[in-house]
Amino acid sequence: MNARITSSAALLLALTSSLAVATCESDAGAILLYPQTTPERPEIPSPHRLADGTEVVVALLKAGSWAVVPVTVENGPLNLPYGRRGTGKGRQLDVDANDFSTLARTGLHSEDELDRTETITGKPVAEITKVGRPEMASGAGFMAADEDIISVLKGDNRLVRRLGLTHREMARPLFHIWNLMLKEYELHRIGRDWDNVRHVEYNGKTIRFGEVHPTRGFQESIFNDEIQGAWQINFFRELDEREWAFLREKYAHLDEARMGELIRKLSHILTGEMEPYYVMRYGFYEGHTDYRVDPIAIAFIFGLKSLEEIEAAFPGQLHEVLTSRFTRSCLPDR
């Protein structure tokens, strides 16, 4: 591994210090971990860090029982058979310090560094942009036809900064969802599709799943890295009455179609397992494609920020910010 890639130990320390989950020194021996289940909901927060450092989420299973699922974000082996390559946690803690030293140090990009960037992982940014466009490396693409890799990195960095968060904080709940799926796959509870979990609780929010299934073959990365994709992951959360009322008041000028678009982009994510690695390592959420993991949607769905806090960061602009592409001439305000 490149010596300039952030060390796992250093990043793990940073993640541990910033993780907003409760820790109970006496809980490690009292909580039953999945695949063991309980008929009643365990009385712990979700997400939660046990005294031994294990990160867990609370899930309601299809059968009606409750599970405390270990979902620790960590580097791990690709030891689960999947096709010819295998799958597993891989390098979840890595950040590309070789290209983005400020990202590795602070969790956010320096725009000066981005302006000077000519290659990422040794690959020219023009080539990354070319293969990332629709109908190149993938049908949907990794960015829109008028976006480029630097404009997308800048645009999302501005969104995350305005939310008062970091890219590693954004990556963590995405990894928790992926690690939940890996646990299910390890237990042979995922086949052509997956419907064993009714919902996951997260910061007081209820995360539900739509269609989740493996795709045909593997999606290769647009960077020179080992990241690959083989799953379609679909999750969302429903707005509560207070949130509906808040948006109707703040965005009363939107017609029904645009309000529906705002709600959909705010509360629903369709993606794959490549994205948490991309967010952690590069601060890359994909451009405005079908598989984008928008930072605003992550913050809303997983309760990293309240709707009021999100609106305060983008007053009156949520529909525009969620739908506008990141071109060189059209980026969100800093």
Feature names for model-found ranges:
Residues S8-S18:
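Bacterial N-terminal signal peptides
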